[in-house]
Amino acid sequence: MTQVFQGRSFLAEKDFTRAELEYLIDFSAHLKDLKKRGVPHHYLEGKNIALLFEKTSTRTRAAFTTAAIDLGAHPEYLGANDIQLGKKESTEDTAKVLGRMFDGIEF
């Protein structure tokens, strides 16, 4: 079964079918196995990912950065001091602009 996730956000499990969730879990296990065996892969080669954090989070930031690099992506960390969410710029406007600039956004 071919899964189409492009253009979709993972906000809640209820937004996905059981088959889609099982696919995501199986694919995650596949990626973990490749990493464990030292098999290189670049599923996200050439993709740019914005990592937006409202609060500092060492483990979460490190996990997302490492995962993005392992997959061949280029992560860009944008912390609370780097962006003006809801201050000088509306959150909606910021999301639209970043959505055009990046292939994926972690928030």
Curated annotation (Swiss-Prot):
Keyword match Transferase: yes
GO cellular component: cytoplasm
Gene3D superfamilies in alphabetical order: Aspartate/ornithine carbamoyltransferase (3.40.50.1370)
SUPFAM superfamilies reported in the protein's UniProt record: Aspartate/ornithine carbamoyltransferase
Matching Pfam families: OTCace_N
Domain of life: Bacteria
GO biological process assignments: arginine biosynthetic process via ornithine; arginine catabolic process to ornithine; citrulline biosynthetic process
Catalysis: reaction(s): carbamoyl phosphate + L-ornithine = L-citrulline + phosphate + H(+)
Main location: cytoplasm
Important for structural integrity (site feature) positions: 32
UniProt subcellular location: Cytoplasm
Protein EC: 2.1.3.3
Keyword Transferase: yes
Family annotation (InterPro entries): Asp/Orn_carbamoyltranf_P-bd, Asp/Orn_carbamoylTrfase, Asp/Orn_carbamoylTrfase_sf, Orn/put_carbamltrans
Pathway given in the UniProt record: Amino-acid degradation; L-arginine degradation via ADI pathway; carbamoyl phosphate from L-arginine: step 2/2
Enzyme class: transferase
Molecular function GO terms recorded: amino acid binding; ornithine carbamoyltransferase activity
Residues at which carbamoyl phosphate binds: 57-61, 84
Keywords from the named record: Arginine metabolism, Cytoplasm, Transferase
Protein family according to the UniProt entry: Belongs to the aspartate/ornithine carbamoyltransferase superfamily. OTCase family.
Record protein name field: Ornithine carbamoyltransferase, catabolic
Annotated organism of origin: Streptococcus pyogenes
Gene that specifies this protein: arcB
